[in-house]
Each structure stands twice: as C-alpha cells, then as structure tokens.
From Swiss-Prot:
Substrates-to-products reaction catalysed: N(6)-carboxybiotinyl-L-lysyl-[protein] + acetyl-CoA = N(6)-biotinyl-L-lysyl-[protein] + malonyl-CoA
MF terms in GO: acetyl-CoA carboxylase activity; ATP binding; carboxyl- or carbamoyltransferase activity
One biological process term in Gene Ontology: malonyl-CoA biosynthetic process
A cellular component term, taken from the record's GO annotations: acetate CoA-transferase complex
Organism of provenance: Methylobacterium radiotolerans (strain ATCC 27329 / DSM 1819 / JCM 2831 / NBRC 15690 / NCIMB 10815 / 0-1)
Residue intervals passing through the bilayer: none
Enzyme class: transferase
This protein's UniProt keywords: ATP-binding, Cytoplasm, Fatty acid biosynthesis, Fatty acid metabolism, Lipid biosynthesis, Lipid metabolism, Nucleotide-binding, Transferase
CoA carboxyltransferase N-terminal domain sequence ranges: 28-297
Subunit structure comment from the entry: Acetyl-CoA carboxylase is a heterohexamer composed of biotin carboxyl carrier protein (AccB), biotin carboxylase (AccC) and two subunits each of ACCase subunit alpha (AccA) and ACCase subunit beta (AccD).
Name under which the protein is recorded: Acetyl-coenzyme A carboxylase carboxyl transferase subunit beta
Subcellular localization, as worded in the UniProt entry: Cytoplasm
C-alpha cells in the first residue's frame, strides 16, 4: 500500500525554503594569499585592502586610492582628454573596442588612469592613480594623455605630482601608439623637473613592463608598498630564459630597497603621512600652509 504524501513536509516546506532562500554573494569573503585566512570583505575594504593580521597588501582601485589619500572634502577629479578608441582596428580573440567596453563597465572609468587635485595633509597636490582592473592598468594613448594632463595640472597649480603606479606594461592592442607614450610621459616628467616641482612615485603591486621602463622609475623619490612586484620582465619569464632559479623575493619591493632601486618601503596606512611630510620638505612649505622656515622660526 502506498503511503499518502505528507504535503506539509514534502511540498509546502521546500517551497517556503526556496521562496526565502538568500543567495550568498561570491565576494563576501576575501582569502589571504599568504595565510589562506578568510576575512570578511567589508573588513578588508575598511582596512584599505590590507589583510588584518598578515598585513598582506591587496590590489587597490584608483578611486579608493584617491579617496584614501586626499583630505576629506578637499579634492576634485581632473577631466581627462578623449582619444581615438581603436586607431588600429585591433582584434584578437575579441575586438579591442569590446574589451574597452567591458573594462569600462567593470571599473566605471574611461581608461586605466584617474587624476585628482586637492589637499593631502593640508598641502595642495596633484595625484595620479593607475587602475589595474582596467586591462591590467596597461599604458595606451588614453593613459599616456592622462599622465600628461596630470603633470600639466601640477605645473599649472604649482603642486607636487604623486603617481601610484600599477600596470602590466604597454597595451599591445595599440602597438607603436602605445610605445610612443613612454617618451611622451618622460618629457612630461622633465617639465616637472625644470619647474622644480616634486615628482613622487609609489610603486604598487604589480608595476611592470613599459611603465617601469618609463615614468614609474623617474621620480625624485620612489616609495613602494610591501611585497610589490616591480620589474620589467617578470621572474617566471627570466627563469625560463636563463634556466636558473632566482633568489627568494627577487624583484619584490624589499629586495629593490636593499639594492638601492627604491628609497623606502611604506605600509599603505602610512603613505598619506609619509607623502605629506616628503612634499613639505621638498617644497619648503609646512603642512599648515606657511613656509617651513617661518614655521620653525615661530
């Protein structure tokens, strides 16, 4: 004899569970690459994308960078020039224009740079941040124009220019037009030098390729975040070429600091204070806005 179906347990209850089931967001937790520890996403975001405990520095978006650095309510976005979106009509597995659309939808930016003008520790500054989430922060015409516009803003406002570098190198979809940005950005740095305005570079993870070979290594002062990969060709490529194992930590921020390529490795939480102090010293202006010599005399 077939038992009658229990409608409450077999039909009604499952439907109620399905009705009120809440999907768990995929990005609710962040896994630490060093320890494997799972940390609540909002906790990591509130800590400026540094894993509490291990202090591992995760990649940080350009908007979050500027928000972290500028004094609250003191900064504005600098409008960036428009460029031809796909001058070479490039196509690989996808059309280049489609890759640009995807990157813009993902990041909310037009390209891999964001420029801001405002105050840091009370001092006027122009900041440029590269967005690694936009096609690996690659250097193309738009990024080159953005860097130059940032330098022009610093020249116009007579402020230090601070760059947060994060890039996989030149953008292959733009070919020679991408490589042209290396000398163009170098000329912009030379103009800052001629105007005796500080140019400070913060090397973040990763800073590689054509960006390292141009404006990222031309600063008056080079700071780096802990553990950042800073190189032209990556360690895997070098090992495959020379068929030898590289030293531990090779091309990381601490290794470059030990070998004189980086002036200081600075924790992300100390970057604002460190940069404000450096700019105060280099411009001879105190963080209160008065000339440093006058402040000391007082």
């Amino acid at each position: 004899m077939v038992e009658p179906m229990n409608w409450i347990s077999e039909v009604v209850r499952p439907r109620i569970k399905t009705l009120f089931k809440r999907e768990t967001p995929e990005n609710l937790w962040v896994k630490c690459p060093d320890t494997g520890q799972m940390v609540f996403h909002k906790e990591v975001e509130a800590n400026h994308w540094v894993i509490p405990g291990s202090e591992h520095h995760l990649k940080m978006g350009a908007q979050a960078r500027l928000k972290m650095m500028f004094d609250e309510g003191t900064w504005i976005d600098v409008a960036l020039p428009e460029v031809a979106p796909d001058p070479l009509k490039f196509r690989d597995e996808k059309r280049y224009v489609d890759r640009l659309k995807e990157a813009r939808a993902k990041t909310g930016l037009q390209d891999a740079f964001k420029i801001g003008f405002g105050r840091v520790g009370g001092l006027p500054m122009t900041l440029a941040a590269q967005e690694f989430g936009f096609m690996a922060g690659s250097l193309g015409m738009a990024a080159g124009e953005a860097f130059v516009r940032g330098a022009e803003t610093a020249l116009e406002k007579r402020t230090p220019y601070v760059l947060f570098a994060a890039s996989g190198g030149a953008r292959m979809q733009e070919g020679i037009l991408s490589l042209m940005q290396m000398p163009r950005t170098t000329v912009a740095v030379r103009r800052l030098n001629a105007a005796r305005l500080p140019y400070i570079v913060v090397l973040t993870n990763p800073t590689t390729g054509g960006v390292t070979a141009s404006y990222a290594m031309l600063g008056d002062v080079h700071l780096a975040e802990p553990g950042a990969l800073i190189c032209f060709a990556g360690p895997r490529v070098i090992e495959q070429t020379i068929r030898e194992k590289l030293p531990d930590g090779f091309q990381r921020a601490e290794y470059l600091r030990e070998h004189g390529m980086v002036d200081q490795v600075v924790h992300r939480h100390q970057l604002k204070e460190t940069i404000a102090r450096l700019c105060s010293l280099l411009t001879n202006v105190s963080q209160a806005g008065a000339p440093a010599a006058a402040s000391e005399a007082a």
